[in-house]
């Protein structure tokens, strides 16, 4: 029995993390065995890489270094956690995955798409999301929400133009792959967002 792989994507302040918990509980209520994880992270080694990636003290990090660290964390995450869970028939919910790399390192940093594609082929292979839920929010709203946090990490400290590029990349990818993406208006109040998610959960129940 094979499981299902669902990823949650979006810019800063989109509310992915809090709604990930709601979504996991909704699926468990339907009798699913759910594993929740995140990227970068998900394993002890990958979480250590996450700390390096996000530490404000590492502001001089080269963009290529950032890209390689992201894929190093992902390789460990896939091998140690995601693939075994899917093989057990579990539903894997992951806060960010490959689309985030195309948005942040590709569009945000302007890194070469051929380099990202080569690393994708090496690391991802055939482990692809069954569905990706995009939490879309205007950049100014997301930045205002993120700004309320105790301290901004290295990525959150980027400028408005950086996050504009990220949002446009996400929307473009959603338009290119409508069968995989479901876009949620994350600028709405939490109750409205969860109503949108409830409809997506209903759709998942129809999966064979």
Curated annotation (Swiss-Prot):
One of its GO terms (biological process) is dTTP biosynthetic process. This is Thymidylate kinase. One of its GO terms (molecular function) is ATP binding. Phosphorylation of dTMP to form dTDP in both de novo and salvage pathways of dTTP synthesis. It comes from the Bacteria. ATP binds at residues 10-17. One of its GO terms (cellular component) is cytosol. NCBIfam families: DTMP_kinase. Keywords: ATP-binding, Kinase, Nucleotide biosynthesis, Nucleotide-binding, Transferase. Its EC number is 2.7.4.9. It catalyses: dTMP + ATP = dTDP + ADP. Belongs to the thymidylate kinase family. The keyword Nucleotide-binding applies. Pfam families: Thymidylate_kin.
């Amino acid at each position: 029995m094979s499981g299902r792989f669902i990823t949650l994507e979006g810019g800063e302040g989109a509310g992915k993390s809090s709604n990930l918990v709601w979504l996991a509980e909704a699926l468990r209520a339907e009798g699913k065995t759910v594993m929740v994880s995140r990227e970068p992270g998900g394993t002890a080694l990958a979480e250590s890489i996450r700390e390096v990636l996000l530490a404000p003290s590492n502001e001089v990090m080269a963009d290529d270094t950032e890209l390689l660290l992201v894929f190093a964390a992902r390789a460990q995450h896939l091998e140690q956690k995601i693939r075994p869970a899917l093989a057990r028939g579990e539903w894997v919910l992951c806060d960010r995955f490959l689309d985030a790399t195309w948005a942040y390192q590709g569009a945000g940093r302007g890194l070469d798409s051929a380099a990202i594609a080569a690393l994708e082929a090496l690391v991802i292979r055939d482990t692809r999301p069954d569905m990706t839920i995009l939490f879309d929010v205007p950049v100014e709203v997301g930045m205002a929400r993120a700004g309320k946090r105790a301290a901004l990490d290295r990525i959150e400290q980027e400028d408005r133009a950086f996050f504009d590029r990220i949002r446009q990349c996400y929307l473009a990818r959603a338009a290119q792959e409508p069968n995989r993406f479901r876009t949620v208006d994350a600028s709405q109040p939490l109750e409205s967002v969860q109503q949108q998610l409830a409809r997506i959960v209903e759709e998942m129940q129809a999966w064979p």
